[in-house]
Design a protein with these regions (language model features):
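Conserved active-site/ligand-binding neighborhood in enzyme cores
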Residues: 1-338
């Protein structure tokens, strides 16, 4: 098996959508509001998007007419977040997504970071309170007006970079036809994202020795709504991502290096947590190339979220999902086992 650093560099603004990006109004209210819509992209692709991209790049037949020949190489079906034991052929495991610049790696700053810190400075002053769910920890170091840290942490020294220095926005105006008995045109604004200051996306991929990577280790991919162009490069490299993150964490913190799909009562197993969530609905590519929308909407715990736990065994039972971890989901890092 070989490990590759996969680098994704957007060549144009991109759009990664989810359930909350479409702020559509009901048809009966459209006339009162000027038929206005606002659609906002996510900053980062989901791990399932990365898995889908890797499967497409590595599949030997891209016309969807040879599913039996493709299946041994990339697996017989798309990634399913609630499945238990899928195989993706030569793709053995993906790491969580991160961003890179000039050889430096950056990950979402842990959400227990004191606001406006130039380096990752975690909360350290906690007090215990009694709740209906048992003893919990609270801190006065969180300032509600400043909110949760919205930055990325450099793994070499813990310095933080505000997200606005990494991600830019570009708003485009278009129109869409609506049906309410008349053929009217409705305006909408679509907010695309682009990477600034020479940042790009990256992740590691463990591939079987039989995997055939693109010639010269370079190719292109079209990702997101609108199929924005990304350049993709493969470089054989050891994966030290988790060990680099661990060095920066306090001893009691469990940090979500990736988005996490967990059972609903996971927060009840924590003494302290700072979390954000994002919606997830799968779009599944069928063997004939047709794309279908999963009817189930899931909630993911967002990368950067942190937990303090008292019972690791029970916590792991709710968060350790091997099939998710193959695609790079559910990577929770701590120094507990050091």
């Amino acid at each position: 098996m070989k490990t590759y650093l996969i680098t994704l560099t957007p060549q144009e603004p991109y759009f990664f959508g989810n359930e909350k990006t479409f702020l559509f109004e009901k048809e009966e209210n459209q006339g009162q509001r000027g038929n206005s819509y606002y659609i906002r992209s996510e900053r980062t692709p989901l791990q399932s998007t990365l898995m889908g991209m890797m499967r497409y790049i590595l599949m030997p037949y891209k016309d969807h007419k040879h599913p039996e020949q493709n299946a041994p190489v990339i697996g017989a079906e798309s990634f399913k977040i609630d499945a238990e034991n899928q195989s993706f052929g030569v793709i053995k495991k993906l790491s969580p997504l991160f961003v890179v610049n000039g050889g430096e790696k950056y990950v979402a700053t842990p959400f227990d970071c004191i606001a406006d810190s130039e380096r990752y400075t975690p909360f350290s002053d906690y007090k215990t309170v009694e709740t209906n769910s048992g003893k919990k920890l609270v801190t006065d170091e969180f300032v509600a007006k400043k909110g949760i840290a919205d930055s990325y942490m450099k793994l070499s020294d813990g310095k933080t970079v505000p997200s606005y220095e990494i991600f830019g926005k570009e708003t485009r105006v278009g129109n869409i036809k609506v049906t309410s008995g008349k053929n009217e045109k409705g305006f909408f604004k679509k907010e695309y994202v682009f990477l600034k200051n020479n940042f790009c996306f990256a992740f590691y991929a463990d591939l079987d020795d039989s995997a055939v990577i693109p010639a010269g280790g370079k190719t292109t991919a079209f990702l997101g709504q609108g199929k924005s162009l990304f350049s993709v490069s493969f470089e054989e490299q050891e994966n030290n991502l988790e060990s680099e993150v661990k060095k920066l964490l306090p001893a009691d913190i469990h940090y979500c290096l990736s988005d996490v799909f967990a059972d609903s009562d996971v927060l009840e197993r924590c003494e302290f947590a700072v979390v954000e969530t994002r919606d997830y609905r799968a779009y599944i590519t069928n063997p004939d190339g047709r794309i279908t929308k999963d009817p189930v909407l899931y909630k993911l715990i967002k990368a950067g979220s942190v937990f303090i736990i008292s019972d690791k065994e029970k916590f792991d039972a709710l968060t350790q999902k091997p099939n998710c971890q193959i695609a790079g989901f559910n990577c929770i890092v701590s120094r507990e086992e050091e």
